[in-house]
């Protein structure tokens, strides 16, 4: 059975954010703490990217207004011995979703890993 790399996108809300950098740091730290507490320290966490609709330049998926930030995180994990891409997706969503309760998740990419 093949192995897959599954990338999920999460929308993380940060309250009392002082800046964009602060919101990114807090989001990564809080997500990492929750994943580590669930013994899922093998999940890679990073800030996602978005492209400007006007110029096409990439920028970090972070938005801060009135001290509240929303950060788009990318969560990547390898799923071993999955029966199909759909099976790998279900495994990743269940594991990460359980650790990051009440955080919206969306599948961004599923590729066969080596």
Curated annotation (Swiss-Prot):
Pfam families noted in UniProt: DUF555 (PF04475)
Family the UniProt entry places it in: Belongs to the UPF0212 family.
Superkingdom classification of source: Archaea
Protein name (Swiss-Prot/TrEMBL): UPF0212 protein UNCMA_00570
PANTHER family cross-referenced by the UniProt entry: UPF0212 PROTEIN MJ0068 (PTHR42199), UPF0212 PROTEIN TK1194 (PTHR42199:SF1)
Range of residues in the leader sequence: none
